[in-house]
């Protein structure tokens, strides 16, 4: 008794913990589940506590009822669902081989499954009957590791027999990845027409050009020799040709095909595709399923900008964040002169670069505009703005592109121009009530929102909203902080204002505060601040994440190459793949890029600023920070 009292006194704990977070803790063992499995396996190996016998092909297998019920729906229903097997000591299992049952029980007790070509089919049959998804997945993965052109039809039949949608998808992916080679085999022509039609309609079909799809459609009906010798009849075109996206084919190829066709529905289809190529200015308004890229790679893309090297030079290279490699790659040289701070818009997967700063031989505002088409890796100069706009913002509302205010380096602007892709023309709409430049804009629910910026030497925190239906502007609640040369993004029905700088401290400083505007409440709030300064950043939204690319940090006194990504669901920032150079004034967006671009080595001319060290002298010869007196962030 004395010992018990002494122990109680030694272990006496405070009634009220001194730290408020020390009331209780929950501990979790990472090793417990494996230790439990080892214990159950030891019971099995020792023949202890067995309470059921499975009779499979006339042979007995002892097991633990509770473990079987916990492992799969089949046994759970049998032993815990009120069936007669609940009370039986011996349970007869039908439709499963003894060897497969032993394999499955070994997995249940160890989480390990050994598969081979000799046992995978019977194991799969058993797993489907016993409803064990993990084993089904393992069997499907094993089968896929052995799939080739000779056995793929057999595996398709197996997938259909057991309704294995995941295996069917894996087989489809195999053909999509190897389509050009597979379409030249006899097995290809043995696939059901509906299956081939579905595959040829897929955006995931891996081909280097649309001509390969055209040939693949013909190879389902003709041999390779017949196709190459042009021994085919197209007067009544095969149904599979409906899947060919003729506008994606090169104009020269289409013309040759058109010239050799007799009058037929196919000839009319090819003629329409040729008209698509000839009406280059109208292509964005001629989009449909047959002009859609065969790709599901949405990438963050950046154009132009000024980057820091021994001299301040500009980039004519576009760059994209490769989602497969997690790094930045160059993919096209811009038709536009070396520029920065261009307005950027995406309409029907065409990129528009609007106005901005023409930085060749000093700084001046630009009125010219360009359009990039990733389908054909082609640039096109569209109609110029009616006046020069530098430090502007650009938004897409409906089917129009709006260029809002800015400056021309003589005057601040309040003019707003609207671009109509169907007529390739700009027209003035209602101007802002007052001039502003170095502002930012975004679109939400059919309206355009513009925030902050500068007027003269003053930094602003104003918010304005444009309603295209009434062609009117109205003012909203001011943002929480003055800023300019920032970015805006729309995500999950809210507007985010990110980066920039101001002189509230009496000198230029970065703004780290990130403001969030709710159109529903009409109020501003703050979210997780930026971890570093981003003035003149590129801004792009992909999925539920906002990418902030490069820019200038006035706190550091330099341009930056870092990338920060905001996760709106977690309200936190993380570091992204760093740009290959410190750069500001990058025009960024999200674009669907061709699959071949991501899977092949980069093509095109190198950035002249990198290839020719003397080129810098053609542009500027001032230091990285001293040029700011005349630059965008003056």
Curated annotation (Swiss-Prot):
The modification Phosphotyrosine is found at residue 466. SUPFAM superfamilies: Kelch motif, POZ domain. Its main location: cytoplasm. Residues 624-634 have a biased composition (Acidic residues). Pathway: Protein modification; protein ubiquitination. Pfam families: BACK, BTB, Kelch_1, Kelch_KLHDC2_KLHL20_DRC7. It is found in: Cytoplasm, Cytosol; Cytoplasm, Cytoskeleton, Microtubule organizing center, Centrosome; Cytoplasm, Cytoskeleton, Spindle; Nucleus. GO terms for cellular component: centrosome; Cul3-RING ubiquitin ligase complex; cytoplasm; cytosol; lysosome; mitotic spindle; nucleus; polar microtubule. The keyword Zinc does not apply. GO terms for biological process: cell division; cellular response to L-leucine; mitotic sister chromatid segregation; mitotic spindle assembly checkpoint signaling; negative regulation of autophagy; positive regulation of cell growth; positive regulation of TORC1 signaling; proteasome-mediated ubiquitin-dependent protein catabolic process. PANTHER family: KELCH-LIKE PROTEIN 22, LD33804P. This is Kelch-like protein 22.
């Amino acid at each position: 008794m004395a010992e018990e009292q002494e122990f109680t006194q030694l272990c006496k704990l405070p009634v009220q913990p001194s730290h408020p977070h020390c009331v209780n803790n929950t501990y979790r063992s990472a090793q417990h589940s494996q230790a439990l499995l080892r214990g159950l396996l030891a019971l099995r190996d020792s023949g202890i506590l067995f309470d059921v016998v499975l009779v499979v092909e006339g042979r007995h297998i002892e097991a633990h009822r509770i473990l079987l019920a916990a492992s799969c729906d089949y046994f759970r229903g049998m032993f815990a669902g009120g069936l007669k097997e609940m009370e039986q000591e011996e349970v007869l299992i039908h439709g499963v081989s003894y060897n497969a049952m032993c394999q499955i029980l070994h997995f249940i007790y160890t989480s390990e499954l050994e598969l081979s070509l000799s046992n995978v089919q019977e194991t799969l049959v058993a797993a489907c009957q016993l409803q064990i998804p993990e084993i089904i997945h393992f069997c499907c993965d094993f089968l896929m590791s052995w799939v080739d052109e000779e056995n793929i039809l057999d595996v398709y039949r197996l997938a259909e027999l057991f309704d294995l949608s995941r295996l069917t998808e894996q087989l489809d992916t195999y053909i999509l990845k190897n389509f050009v080679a597979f379409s030249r085999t006899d097995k290809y022509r043995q696939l059901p027409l509906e299956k081939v039609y579905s595959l040829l309609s897929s955006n995931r079909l891996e081909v280097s050009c649309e001509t390969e799809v055209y040939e693949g459609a013909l190879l389902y009906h003709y041999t390779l020799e017949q196709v190459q010798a042009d021994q085919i009849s197209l007067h009544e075109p095969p149904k599979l040709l409906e899947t060919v996206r003729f506008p994606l084919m090169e104009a020269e190829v289409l013309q040759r095909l058109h010239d050799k066709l007799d009058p037929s529905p196919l000839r009319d289809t090819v003629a329409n595709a040729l008209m698509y190529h000839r009406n280059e200015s109208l292509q964005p308004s001629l989009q449909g399923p047959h002009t859609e890229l065969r790709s599901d790679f949405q990438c963050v893309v950046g154009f132009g900008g000024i980057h820091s090297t021994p001299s301040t030079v500009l980039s004519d290279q576009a760059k994209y964040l490769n989602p497969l490699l997690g790094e930045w790659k160059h993919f096209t040289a811009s038709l536009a002169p070396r520029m920065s701070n261009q307005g950027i818009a995406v309409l029907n997967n065409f990129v528009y670069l609007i106005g901005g700063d023409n930085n060749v031989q000093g700084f001046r505002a630009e009125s010219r505009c360009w359009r990039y088409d990733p389908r054909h890796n082609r640039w096109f100069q569209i109609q110029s703005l009616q006046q020069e706009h530098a430090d502007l913002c650009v938004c897409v509302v409906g089917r129009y592109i709006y260029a809002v205010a800015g400056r021309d380096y003589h005057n601040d602007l309040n003019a707003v121009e609207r671009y109509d892709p169907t007529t390739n023309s700009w027209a003035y709409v209602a101007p802002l009530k007052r001039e502003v430049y170095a502002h930012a804009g975004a679109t939400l629910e059919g309206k355009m929102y513009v925030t902050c910026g500068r007027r003269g030497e003053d930094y602003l925190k104003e918010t304005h909203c444009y309603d295209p239906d009434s062609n009117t502007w109205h003012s909203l609640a001011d943002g929480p902080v003055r800023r300019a040369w920032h970015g805006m993004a729309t995500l999950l029905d809210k507007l985010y204002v990110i980066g920039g700088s101001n002189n509230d401290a009496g000198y230029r400083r970065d703004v780290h505060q990130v403001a969030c505007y709710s159109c529903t409440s009409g109020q501003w709030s703050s979210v997780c601040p930026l971890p570093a300064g981003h003035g003149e950043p590129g801004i792009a939204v992909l999925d539920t994440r906002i990418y902030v690319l490069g820019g200038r940090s006035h706190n550091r006194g330099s341009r930056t190459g870092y990338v920060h990504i905001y996760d709106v669901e977690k309200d936190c920032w993380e570091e992204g793949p760093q740009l290959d150079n410190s750069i500001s004034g990058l025009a960024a967006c999200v674009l669907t890029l061709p699959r071949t671009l991501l899977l092949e080595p980069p093509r095109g001319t190198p950035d002249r600023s990198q290839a020719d060290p003397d080129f810098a002298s053609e542009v500027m010869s001032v230091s990285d920070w001293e040029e700011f007196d005349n630059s965008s962030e003056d």
